[in-house]
Amino acid sequence: MSIKFSFKDEVFSLDKLQLPSRHYHFNDNENYIKLLNIGEGIFPKDKIRTSLSLDNSNLIFTTESATKIYPSKKEYGIQKIDIVLKNNSNLEFINDELILYKDSRYIQFFNLKSDENSTFFYTDILSRGRSFENFDFSNMLIKNSFFCEKSMEYMEKFDVKGAELKDYINRKSSSNFIFAKIYIKTNNNEEFLNRIYLEKFESFTYTKNKKIILGVISSNNMFELKNQIFKIWELYRKELNKSKFNLGKQ
């Protein structure tokens, strides 16, 4: 199952839709796509691919709601996301949280390729599951790859078992159990990182070649966590001389 779309010179094109989903494209002031998966989740054996290309274009992209990963005895639900940015493009990908149900198994492949002058803001959020669960999923495998100017700039791999993550948080005696990872590329990363520090977000740093900024934030409240993300996103938009944007979600 897949969806593939692109923008060239700010013009939208839906290239493929073989996915039980709806997408909403708005263009009052900026290109904005909200993607709604029917059933709002990923089931065992699902293989979902999202492909996006921007050429001299800007896009704000988000999901309608949290992505639920349903239980499985042995099969994995798989999601693959491929993104290409070129010719001064800008992507702002505001992801809602993953909710891994008890006994769920999930694999994610995320690949982003950007040229020198394009920019992006991308977030991933992991919750502890449904309100009555506490990292009771079986296994989560993540591979995120970022390329800048055709060279690998950053890659991370996670093989996480719910029981191990729960044990780690308990040993750390942390009250926070919701985590967000943020990936940012601007045209002046040094200046933007200093701006983040001034706002008291301290868990941010560069990748090896300083072409991407990485950050982690955590909280025990989803509303509070998303407010932190939106604050950093607002700083990013100011860096691009853009005003605050309302996603129009609860």
Curated annotation (Swiss-Prot):
Q: Which domain of life is it from?
A: Bacteria
GO terms for MF = nickel cation binding
Any one Gene Ontology cellular component term annotated for this protein? cytoplasm
What InterPro entries does the entry give? UreD
- Chief place where the protein resides: cytoplasm
Subcellular localization: Cytoplasm
What keywords appear on the UniProt entry?
Chaperone, Cytoplasm, Nickel insertion
| UniProt-listed PANTHER family | UREASE ACCESSORY PROTEIN D
Assembly, per entry: UreD, UreF and UreG form a complex that acts as a GTP-hydrolysis-dependent molecular chaperone, activating the urease apoprotein by helping to assemble the nickel containing metallocenter of UreC. The UreE protein probably delivers the nickel.
Return the similarity comment: Belongs to the UreD family.
Known function: Required for maturation of urease via the functional incorporation of the urease nickel metallocenter.
What protein name applies here? Urease accessory protein UreD
